[in-house]
UniProtKB/Swiss-Prot annotation:
Keywords: Glycosidase, Hydrolase, Signal. It holds the Pfam family Glyco_hydro_92N. GO terms for molecular function: carbohydrate binding; hydrolase activity, acting on glycosyl bonds; peptide-N4-(N-acetyl-beta-glucosaminyl)asparagine amidase activity. GO terms for biological process: carbohydrate metabolic process; glycoprotein catabolic process. Its EC number is 3.2.1.-. Belongs to the glycosyl hydrolase 92 family. GO terms for cellular component: cytosol. This is Uncharacterized glycosidase Rv0584. Residues 1-32 form the signal peptide. Gene3D superfamilies: 2.70.98.10, alpha-1,2-mannosidase, alpha-1,2-mannosidases domains, GH92 mannosidase domain. InterPro entries: 6-hairpin_glycosidase_sf, GH-type_carb-bd, GH92_a_mannosidase_put, GH92_N, Glyco_hydro_92, PNGase.
């Protein structure tokens, strides 16, 4: 996509940055000769990739193409009309530029909007937009963006520092006078308040108060200071109802203003943000905004080049390299710096605090989305930043009483479900972060997991925890509501993962007692496994599963009752810490292969069909499940198919990027690795996309990946063998220590599947089954009517949950004279299942009424008791 023009622009930029070499080496493919490592990775980032609209299921991808630094406070980027995340490449109408952005799924950010224009002001400038040119004049590279407005002739260029956006705007000489709109009351989620102050003839300051993310109650206020390179000759304000020429200030939820300049002006506009105060924004501007536009642009490019150089790749065509480095770039945009240059920031308690010198306080954690693949990547590449991220969350908890869920600015939105901040923290820690308050971090995890985690303004980190601990699962009650539907099943699955992460973290700190408790709790997902249907299903507080099949097709809406953004088939596979236990529950390897083959027949279906939704987070790890069941060649094939959903185009992603979640998935998949088990450093493998790759570890060591034949016209798609530090390995996963010590991985590849390598049971990645129940039970019809003197039967469905358990017994107990049922015993079938018929006899002497029978099913060292209600009534003739 405009690659030649993009590379020319980058060549000029890199020369200014001091990064230019005598010539820019193109990326050779394997058939060009020996693959050469990419020398300048910023040359291969195109920020317009993934900024458009995908297919019907994909919808808006919601990436922004504008200027930012790694993990910066500012994301200075264009906006298009009626796009809730800011920008859509397929939309030709632009409202200008704003200072904050993220690839979110609800209206958010877009704070402090500005529009350079020559169109006369008119009576409603707060609604103004201009046509934007999505052609070869629109260029986006790390730290720089430029675009043309064909209707007015204005050319805009943007660059950024951590807390400042710098714009250069060229107005046409032969045209209307230059105008510059500033809209503090135009945040994408709307504004509860906004101010604007024209302080002198080169300075505008103000604030925007926004929030209400996805209908939640969060609020934040961001302040700004804006400095123009030349005095303006006219000015005014508006309030969303009228325009006030000559007015210096405005205080309205629709606040805005304008300033005017002569035709042909070339303006540099520097805008700094602060979440503390206008004075904080001024100080940030003074500290970061003094250099020339070109010098800032070059420095930002250098910063990005250093960050992206943590991973070097060689081989493959330019399109794949561009996709890879653009995805790596997007993996380093969030979370965001939240403190000013002097260290001050607004806390969750509404009080101004200061972060320790040399550290950064971060905000904006889309935890449910990012803990799976983004947190491991950031922890591996940037452990010191990752440490500050964890400490920021720990500090948030200390200020508010609990960890936030989907933290935006300085408050918890409560968006999504689960307690996903826990595996986010533990993944960052496992992959390298160490410099934070470990004791306090564990304390707040355990507090929420046992007491609920009471935060501010009614926020609960784990709502419904008392019922969860009493029942061993999240029931279908209001406390387990998520995104408009009650999601007890998916919450239970998430909390099982969360508790496993707590167990691993506690164990690493030497707290073996806590580790054991939460390891046992990590198996609570088994309490929702319905042996009648073979699904992990929602369950009532009384213990009943829904009637009918486990998967229910919904022709509309956003998923199935009991599940957050998905359905029973999609969530079935989310037991990453005990895949072996799930395989046993589903009847063993052969049965699971058939089911997984059917599930991956389609790759990106959305929340309502019983197939993989590759663009949504619960399905991220599915392609690697074949590594657990003896068919790793299908992992290699499926990962390759999903990678094909990405590409170097505006529509080149299978879903909403969710603050780098989807992009980080691609980075791992392209390297041939995936962090399969949250809370651990287990990396399971697939065929790499590049002939060579090097992951530079901060310790000075590296992970070297060699896969001859991965690139080229006739690329080899299947793993034929693997050596780790020159030792042959038949395992489909790497030693956990490799993320610390580094190592050399050499993949031997082939054009056809090797159906021997990696197929042994010992080759599967580890599962953590301690605390598992040996059996799960359901009685689909627990109410039975029997007339006196007759016998009825109920069916007990049971499923073995641990391999090696062969025998079961069913013991019905009645405490009513005249009602009897005989015990029975037997062996599970080859799939570990049984449907046992229990005969219940009612004597003629038993009066009409309701009588419970307690049916206990035992296997191994586990026993589960369910109640059958016998309704005795005389027959009606």
């Amino acid at each position: 996509m405009r690659a030649r023009r993009l590379r020319r622009a980058l060549a000029a930029l890199l020369a200014v940055a001091g990064l230019f070499v005598p010539f820019i080496v193109g990326v050779p493919t394997a058939y060009d000769g020996e693959p050469v490592f990419v020398a300048i990775p910023v040359e291969h980032v195109n920020t317009l990739i993934g900024t458009g609209t995908g297919a019907a299921i994909v919808g808006e991808i919601n990436n922004f193409p504008g200027a930012s630094v790694p993990f910066g406070m500012v994301q200075y980027s264009p906006d298009t009309v009626d796009n809730y995340a800011g920008y859509d490449y397929d939309n030709p109408h632009s409202t200008g530029f704003s200072m904050t952005h993220a690839s979110v799924g609800c209206p958010a950010f877009g704070d402090i909007s500005m529009l350079p224009t020559t169109t006369p002001l008119g009576s409603q400038p707060w609604s103004a937009w201009e046509e934007i040119a999505h052609d070869d004049t629109e260029v986006g590279v790390p730290g720089y963006y430029t675009v043309r407005f064909p209707g007015t002739g204005v050319i805009a260029e943007l660059t950024a520092t951590t807390r400042t956006g710098v714009g250069r705007f060229r107005y046409p000489r032969n045209g209307w006078p230059a105008l510059f709109h500033v809209r503090s009351g135009a945040s994408l989620a709307g504004n509860y308040a906004a101010t604007l102050q024209i302080e002198d003839n080169t300075t505008i300051t103000g604030s925007a108060t926004s929030g209400g993310f996805c209908g939640k109650k969060n609020l934040y206020t961001v302040y700004f200071a804006m400095k123009f390179s030349q005095p303006f000759s006219s000015y005014g304000t508006w309030d969303g109802y009228a325009v006030y020429p000559g007015s210096h200030s405005m205080n309205s939820s629709y606040s805005g203003g304008y300033v005017g300049f002569p035709a042909g002006s070339v303006l540099e506009v520097r805008t700094a943000l602060s979440y503390v105060s206008v004075d904080g924004a001024r100080a940030n501007l003074d500290a970061e905004g003094g250099a020339s536009f070109d010098d800032i642009r070059a420095a930002t490019s250098s910063e990005w080049n250093a960050a992206l150089s943590r991973i070097a790749v060689a081989g493959r065509g330019p399109g794949d390299v561009d996709t890879f480095y653009t995805c790596l770039y997007r993996s380093l945009l969030h979370p965001n710096t939240f403190n000013d240059v002097d260290g001050r920031y607004i806390g969750f308690d509404g009080v101004i605090h200061s972060v320790a010198s040399g550290h950064t306080h971060y905000a904006n954690f889309s935890d449910w989305d990012t803990y799976r693949s983004l947190a491991p990547l950031q922890g591996l590449l940037f452990p010191q930043r990752a440490s500050d991220m964890i400490q920021s969350l720990v500090t948030d908890a200390e200020q508010s009483g609990a960890y936030p869920r989907w933290a935006l600015a300085n408050s918890a939105t409560g968006m999504m479900s689960g307690d996903s901040v826990v595996p986010l923290i533990v993944n960052l820690y496992a992959f390298g972060a160490r410099d934070f308050d470990l004791k306090s971090a564990l304390h707040y995890m355990v507090n929420a997991a046992t007491q609920g985690g009471v935060g501010l303004d009614g926020f609960l980190e784990r709502p419904g925890i008392a019922a969860y601990l009493r029942l061993g699962y999240g029931p279908q009650t209001a406390e387990f509501r998520a995104n408009g539907r009650i999601a007890g099943a998916s919450v239970t699955l998430e909390w099982s993962v969360d508790d496993f992460a707590i167990s691993r973290f506690a164990d690493s700190l030497g707290d073996t007692a806590t580790a054991a408790v939460f390891q046992n709790r990590s198996q609570y997902w088994q309490n929702l496994f319905n042996p009648t249907t073979g699904y992990i299903s929602p369950r009532s507080a009384a213990g009943f599963f829904p009637d009918g099949p486990g998967f229910v097709a919904y022709p509309s809406g956003f998923g199935q009752d009991g599940y957050d953004e998905g359905n029973a088939e999609q969530y079935l596979w989310w037991v990453p810490h005990n895949v072996a236990g799930l395989v046993t529950a589903l009847g063993g390897r052969t049965a699971v292969v058939k089911r997984l083959d059917r599930f991956t027949k389609k790759l990106n279906v959305g929340p309502n069909e019983p197939y993989l939704w590759a663009g949504n987070e619960p399905g991220f790890g599915v392609p690697w499940l074949y590594n657990y069941i003896g068919q790793p060649w299908k992992t290699q094939r499926t990962v390759d198919r999903v990678r094909g959903l990405f590409g170097p185009t505006p529509g080149g992603a299978p879903g909403n990027d969710d603050l780098g979640a989807l992009s980080s998935w691609y980075v791992w998949a392209a390297l041939g690795l995936y962090p399969s088990t949250p809370g651990t450093t287990i990396l399971t493998v697939n065929t790499p996309l590049f002939d060579r790759a090097v992951i530079a570890l901060p310790t000075g060591k590296s992970i070297q990946i060699t896969a001859p034949g991965a690139s080229g016209r006739n690329r080899l798609k299947y793993i034929d063998g693997l050596t780790i530090d020159r030792q042959p390995s038949n395992q489909t996963f790497l030693p956990e220590s490799i993320v610390r010590t580094g190592g050399d991985l050499t993949f031997s590849l082939a054009g056809t599947p090797n159906k021997v390598w990696g197929t042994a049971a010992s080759a599967a990645p580890p599962s953590f089954g301690a605390g598992s129940s040996a059996v799960t039970v359901n009685i689909a019809r627990p109410i039975i009517g029997i007339v006196p003197g007759a016998t009825g039967t109920v069916t007990v469905d049971a499923q073995r949950m641990i391999d090696g358990v062969d025998d079961y017994t069913v013991t019905p107990t009645s405490y009513v004279v005249g009602i009897a049922a005989e015990p029975l015993s037997g062996q599970f079938d080859d799939d570990g299942a049984v449907s046992a018929s229990v005969a219940i006899t009612v004597a003629r002497s038993v009066p009409s009424g309701y009588y419970p029978i307690y049916v206990t099913t035992s296997a191994g060292d586990s026993a589960r008791t369910l109640i059958v209600l016998v309704v005795v009534a005389e027959a009606v003739e």
